[in-house]
């Protein structure tokens, strides 16, 4: 029965001893200073995962994560963690689109863990994840936030590069997104996709790019009607809001119009703040 389901931590496949694998993890801690600004408190990184804090002319710092391996394939393991202490504010992003390449053996693993202390605000805006034919990937994103914290989260999936004439005939992607507010599970989105889900109208209906925007804040519902009115021609989306949450789901025939549409939504939910420079719109 549906009501007996419980979110489970992602399991990690054993790495194949026959092929070289990419492994990396990066962790950043941001802290609110006495003057009210947010600054780096701790940074640790290893392997192919890197974290950078570019110089920005804005009151809120940006934390940019990078996978120097250039993508994820079977047996790879990539982990990002971003912790905001009480009152801290930051924008998190990835330096470029993440690519999941053809897998010869095993599953590529990606993990993201985000924590928000009391009164903290995090805008987690990674660039799109591009799925390639033959890829096998599992991603798990876990968020732990205080009751009065604010989270803006945008996640985009692209099914092959349309400009390159790519079509996906075989792939496997599993995504598990969990948000706990004050210890209570308030958003859980398990997603399993393969090539059979691309064409049917009851699934993706031929869309080449999909996105989810989640906004969790005490007054999140107030933005619902404004976000609904932003829906552009050529991009299908629906918006719902309840219990301090706003969720938008969007479908488009190509990634570029979807990204431009998302930029308008994020501009509103970020109260006019510019997008991270790495988005390069």
UniProtKB/Swiss-Prot annotation:
Main location: cytoplasm
Gene Ontology CC terms: cytoplasm
InterPro entries assigned: UreD (IPR002669)
Protein's cellular compartments: Cytoplasm
Entries under Pfam families matching the protein: UreD
Keywords on record: Chaperone, Cytoplasm, Nickel insertion
Molecular function (Gene Ontology), one example: nickel cation binding
Disordered: annotated segments: 1-25
HAMAP family: UreD (MF_01384)
Role this protein plays: Required for maturation of urease via the functional incorporation of the urease nickel metallocenter.
Oligomeric and partner information: UreD, UreF and UreG form a complex that acts as a GTP-hydrolysis-dependent molecular chaperone, activating the urease apoprotein by helping to assemble the nickel containing metallocenter of UreC. The UreE protein probably delivers the nickel.
Protein family per UniProt: Belongs to the UreD family.
Name assigned to this protein: Urease accessory protein UreD
Record lineage: Bacteria, Pseudomonadati, Pseudomonadota, Alphaproteobacteria, Rhodobacterales
